[in-house]
Amino acid sequence: MKGTRAIGSVPERSPAGVDLSLTGLPPPVSRRPGSAATTKPIVRSVSVVTGSEQKRKVLEATGPGGSQAINNLRRSNSTTQVSQPRSGSPRPTEPTDFLMLFEGSPSGKKRPASLSTAPSEKGATWNVLDDQPRGFTLPSNARSSSALDSPAGPRRKECTVALAPNFTANNRSNKGAVGNCVTTMVHNRYTPSERAPPLKSSNQTAPSLNNIIKAATCEGSESSGFGKLPKNVSSATHSARNNTGGSTGLPRRKEVTEEEAERFIHQVNQATVTIQRWYRHQVQRRGAGAARLEHLLQAKREEQRQRSGEGTLLDLHQQKEAARRKAREEKARQARRAAIQELQQKRALRAQKASTAERGPPENPRETRVPGMRQPAQELSPTPGGTAHQALKANNTGGGLPAAGPGDRCLPTSDSSPEPQQPPEDRTQDVLAQDAAGDNLEMMAPSRGSAKSRGPLEELLHTLQLLEKEPDVLPRPRTHHRGRYAWASEVTTEDDASSLTADNLEKFGKLSAFPEPPEDGTLLSEAKLQSIMSFLDEMEKSGQDQLDSQQEGWVPEAGPGPLELGSEVSTSVMRLKLEVEEKKQAMLLLQRALAQQRDLTARRVKETEKALSRQLQRQREHYEATIQRHLAFIDQLIEDKKVLSEKCEAVVAELKQEDQRCTERVAQAQAQHELEIKKLKELMSATEKARREKWISEKTKKIKEVTVRGLEPEIQKLIARHKQEVRRLKSLHEAELLQSDERASQRCLRQAEELREQLEREKEALGQQERERARQRFQQHLEQEQWALQQQRQRLYSEVAEERERLGQQAARQRAELEELRQQLEESSSALTRALRAEFEKGREEQERRHQMELNTLKQQLELERQAWEAGRTRKEEAWLLNREQELREEIRKGRDKEIELVIHRLEADMALAKEESEKAAESRIKRLRDKYEAELSELEQSERKLQERCSELKGQLGEAEGENLRLQGLVRQKERALEDAQAVNEQLSSERSNLAQVIRQEFEDRLAASEEETRQAKAELATLQARQQLELEEVHRRVKTALARKEEAVSSLRTQHEAAVKRADHLEELLEQHRRPTPSTK
């Protein structure tokens, strides 16, 4: 179906009209299918400013005729209206749609604005591989007449568009690395020598990217039920290019039918929707698993951060970021200088060529043209590589350049979050690349108003734009997942939405091996510079080809007339004026873009500062809570220490009181004993005095009698000597008694003092030792905990860094195969977490209950033992006092016995001479004295026995007190061991809890290894199958060769037989002819 339509307008919007905006969430950059849209090698990050100059030239080349491919694409999502081709006069004042601007809301509702508006001469930007979509406003004069005449009436048309974001080389995420890998792979797989002009058929596709998209579509069809994608996006590109070529005026160019194009576009949209839905489901599952794992490891992370300083991690991260930023800026500066020099050289060459081309038409009449004439269609069709490259350049242009004019009515209303902040060097780089691409695109067709169809670049951009829109069947709100280290990589804060891109396909493991991506710090990579240079070269070649084709296709006339020369001069003047105007507009656009980028930079800096301040506040709160918890623990330890010291002091006070009571009782017993001894001494002295006086009186009587008998002098001598002896014995006895009493009292006091001092020293030494040991244990435990936490924090930081790096490397290859394993891991980890939590709670409650019971029992036992000890102490003191009294009595008795025996011996010796006279009286008196003394001795022996018993009791009490002290010390040591065991159990539980992450990580690595082993086995099986298939193909080839050889032999044999038969027939004919000829004899 052929036809033309006005370029400057699109179908009017009706309730059932065409609305190509696939409503829904605008997919992020790295998930969009723009990277797989062309067959040309994909360049990682190439920016193009689709300025007004190239669009005006394309319009002048395409003329009023609309492209059939654009009609087909615009009818792809409409069910009630099909745009019919229409013809009209060319309207050069109305700009064409270079990018089909469409609007999508996160809620999935239908937008009130039409899709028909497009950027005008102010220029438009379009980004493919960025993280965030950018919106820009369009001037009011950029709208076509049909869009302004829409039946929406006074309803305001919103022109803010969420364009595909820009993927520059400063994107340091894994998506950038995957994009580089895909770029390098496609560069290596598709060299420029393999490129060929596209076929006219719409089924022509690029084999590798088609396989990639089919692989992703097959995986998506498992959950959605859609069929296999029959055609590739590149086929849509070829179809658009072929349709463009067919509508430019060449006679009888073959085109695809409308139904086929609609069916193909519908299938592409369905496949895109399926893949997006499937990937979104997978992203949700991964996010849920990551959240559960994060919740599981959150407690451990808090323990890891509790002893670190408030700003240690943040300062380290800022230092690393500053160093990385410096290196990146230096590299960017060098690369920009090189790119600026090359672009300046290219521009100088282009300006020189343009000046020679402008001076050329008066000399070559074939290059002159009448302003109203149409040019052939070859002027608009550059090389296929150039077309594909232009599409890629347009896809990668920065989306931050607004196309606002004086009459702007459209304000940016993008709901998505602003794009990641770029430094000024990156913005300068993007603007430089866009300016270069805009200058390169100026070498397109020289005129804009004389062609019949739109260029293939616009159709490619429109097709990619339709494919990159989010489908309206899954309006899902965004969910931002911020991990612990999300502030460390603010560039990659955009959530992972789903789309059909080479990045996703590479992450799902559908791409084969490809080289390593460039390092993250490169701002202007070699691939980008090479792509810019190759694009400039191709554009120069295409411009030269266009000039050649103009020279070849132009019919020479008899000679240029003055009218033609004047028209050409006026045309060149108008073109130069238009170029000057467009340059001015481009300069205004760039100035606005620079201002917007500055505002955006300031806003992003403020947001980053706010996020960092919030995170710093969270960390400060966390550290303060940790410090408060530790201070509370230290206060609890201090309180426990105070309680123990108070208990110890109470025990010491009780011991002191007992000692004081004991000393008081000893003093009382000694005083009583002294009183009793004094009474006994007084009684003994009185009785002895009475006895002595009586004895003296009797002796005096006897002496008188003896004196009477003549013995008086001798008796007087004996009496005098006896008195002296008695006085001497009395003095000795009194001195010995005093000495013995003094020695006994001194010895008792000395022993009591020694015991008291020894007890005090032992108490002080034990208290000091206990305090020192407790302090050393606490200090050692505190140092060990700090060291262990520091080591564990460092180890976990290194492990987290290594784990992130390793997982980032492995996730690109294994994510599609590991979804089941991750779900199982999440279930097992959640079950294990619940079991461990329940077990830990149970153990903690049991430990607390057991500890409380043990404390209660220990308190009761301590109270009972204290009471028993007090009772035993009193008994021992009484026994000791009795023993001491007995000992004193025994000593007194022994001294007294000695004194009595001495007195008896002296008296017997003294009375030896008077024995005969006083024997009877002396014997009777001795008997009386012996009886009396024996009674007193028996009493003293009884008192001595009592004192001995009391002393033994006191000794037993002292031994019991020492045993009690030893037992209490043993109990203290036992409690310390129990406390150490509890601490060991606590440390073991803490280590088990810390090792939980390691166990989960080990299990995950084991499963990864198993999945890798399965992958290797599958690859080996695939290799065997391929080898078997190759062998079978070789066998078939061999059989075909043998069959062909046999056929050739049969044909050759038949040919020889045929030749022999022909020879035989010729021979027979000759013979027959000879027989027919009459013989000469017959004549």
Curated annotation (Swiss-Prot):
GO terms for molecular function: protein homodimerization activity; protein-containing complex binding. Residues 68-87, 138-148, 232-245 have a biased composition (Polar residues). Ubiquitinated. Undergoes monoubiquitination catalyzed by the E3 ubiquitin-protein ligase MIB1 in proliferating cells, preventing cilia formation. Monoubiquitination by MIB1 is inhibited in response to cellular stress, such as ultraviolet light (UV) radiation or heat shock, resulting in cilia formation initiation. MAPKAPK2-dependent phosphorylation at Ser-47 and Ser-78 occurs in response to cellular stress such as exposure to ultraviolet irradiation and promotes binding to 14-3-3 proteins which leads to cytoplasmic sequestration of CEP131 and blocks formation of new centriolar satellites. Phosphorylation at Ser-78 mediated by PLK4 is essential for proper organization and integrity of centriolar satellites but is dispensable for its localization to centrioles and its function in ciliogenesis. Residues 1-155, 220-258, 301-429, 1047-1083 are annotated as: Disordered. Its main location: cytoplasm. Residues 317-333, 360-369, 1047-1076 have a biased composition (Basic and acidic residues). The modification Phosphothreonine is found at T383. Keywords: Cell cycle, Cell projection, Cilium biogenesis/degradation, Cytoplasm, Cytoplasmic vesicle, Cytoskeleton, Developmental protein, Differentiation, Phosphoprotein, Spermatogenesis, Transport, Ubl conjugation. Induction: Up-regulated by the transcription factor SP1. Residues 269-289 form the IQ domain. GO terms for biological process: cilium assembly; intraciliary transport involved in cilium assembly; intramanchette transport; manchette assembly; non-motile cilium assembly; positive regulation of cell population proliferation; positive regulation of intracellular protein transport; protein localization to centrosome. GO terms for cellular component: acrosomal vesicle; centriolar satellite; centriole; centrosome; ciliary basal body; ciliary transition zone; cilium; cytosol. Changing S47A: Partially reduces in vitro phosphorylation by MAPKAPK2 and decreases binding to 14-3-3. Abolishes in vitro phosphorylation by MAPKAPK2, interaction with 14-3-3 and stress-induced centriolar satellite remodeling. It is found in: Cytoplasm, Cytoskeleton, Microtubule organizing center, Centrosome; Cytoplasm, Cytoskeleton, Microtubule organizing center, Centrosome, Centriolar satellite; Cytoplasm, Cytoskeleton, Microtubule organizing center, Centrosome, Centriole; Cytoplasm, Cytoskeleton, Cilium basal body. The modification Phosphoserine is found at S14, S35, S47, S78, S89, S105, S114, S146, S150, S381, S453, S499, S731, S798. Residues 1-250 are annotated as: Interaction with PLK4. Self-associates. Associates with the centriolar satellite BBSome protein complex. Interacts with BBS4; the interaction limits BBS4 availability for association with the BBSome complex, and hence negatively regulates ciliary localization of the BBSome complex. Interacts with MIB1. Interacts with PCM1; the interaction increases in response to ultraviolet light (UV) radiation. Associates with microtubules; association with microtubules is reduced in response to cellular stress, such as UV stimulation, in a process that requires p38 MAP kinase signaling. Transient cell cultured-based knock-down (by RNAi) of CEP131 leads to a reduction in ciliogenesis. However, analysis of mice with chronic absence of CEP131 following genetic deletion (knockout) shows that cilia develop and function normally in vivo. This suggests that CEP131 is not essential for ciliogenesis, except for the modified cilia of the developing sperm flagella, and that there is an alternative mechanism to compensate for the lack of CEP131. Component of centriolar satellites contributing to the building of a complex and dynamic network required to regulate cilia/flagellum formation. In proliferating cells, MIB1-mediated ubiquitination induces its sequestration within centriolar satellites, precluding untimely cilia formation initiation. In contrast, during normal and ultraviolet or heat shock cellular stress-induced ciliogenesis, its non-ubiquitinated form is rapidly displaced from centriolar satellites and recruited to centrosome/basal bodies in a microtubule- and p38 MAPK-dependent manner. Belongs to the CEP131 family. This is Centrosomal protein of 131 kDa. It comes from Homo sapiens (Human).
